[in-house]
UniProtKB/Swiss-Prot annotation:
HAMAP family: RNA_free_RNase_P (MF_01078). The lineage of its organism: Bacteria, Pseudomonadati, Aquificota, Aquificia, Aquificales. RNA-free RNase P that catalyzes the removal of the 5'-leader sequence from pre-tRNA to produce the mature 5'-terminus. This is RNA-free ribonuclease P. InterPro entries: PIN-like_dom_sf, RNA_free_RNase_P.
Length: 186
């Protein structure tokens, strides 16, 4: 049976991951990944929203035709995919907890009488982002990766904690992206 593999931008933009493919820049890792796909029996998919996001982060102009010939750019059929109500319930509860945590962080920083406003704002942004976004689905691109994996009964190859956490909740197989080369060679 041939694996359908769904990828996201993290494998090309997270230095810890893309350096396992190529020691250079993200564009070099993408070119190396394209080479790996040609030797693999697996079908590689990327949701269109993720592709658009990748194009904003990395200039693909010089390799766009090879990328689109090697990786299937496909949106999930959002109209026909059914999501378990318990998953929605869990997501809303998780968001409520995160929002409350974010409010507590904001209150803590509002009470801080430090004179260095710029430093305080930077710390607030970092803690707030960590509280609200880390380990959960925090974008439509993340949701599309999950939905496409459900639709195609696929395997997710991502370094995003939120995607991997929610893939686990839905029973979707994930592969550690540090093992990209080995995974694609089987």
């Amino acid at each position: 049976m041939q694996d359908n593999v769904i990828i996201d931008t993290s494998i090309f933009t997270n230095p810890n991951i893309y350096k396992s493919i190529s020691l250079e820049q993200p564009i070099d890792a993408i070119e190396a990944f394209i080479g790996l796909t040609h030797k693999s029996s697996k079908k590689i998919y990327m949701p269109r929203t993720v592709y658009i996001e990748l194009c904003k982060v990395v200039d693909l102009e010089s390799i766009k035709s090879r990328f689109e010939s090697s990786i299937i750019i496909k949106s999930p059929n959002r109209c026909n995919i059914t999501i378990n109500a318990l998953a929605l319930f869990d997501f809303v509860e998780d968001m409520r907890i995160r929002i409350n945590k974010g409010l507590r962080i904001a209150e803590e920083f509002a009470r801080d009488k430090t004179q260095d406003i710029q430093n305080t704002i930077s710390k607030l942004r970092e803690k707030y982002k960590e509280a609200l976004r880390q380990g959960t689905l925090d974008s439509k691109e993340d949701v599309d990766v999950i939905l496409l994996a459900l639709e195609l009964n696929g395997v997710i190859l991502s370094g995003d904690e939120g995607i991997n956490s929610w893939a686990d909740k839905f029973g979707i197989r994930t592969v550690n992206p540090l093992f990209i080369q080995e995974f694609l060679s089987f």
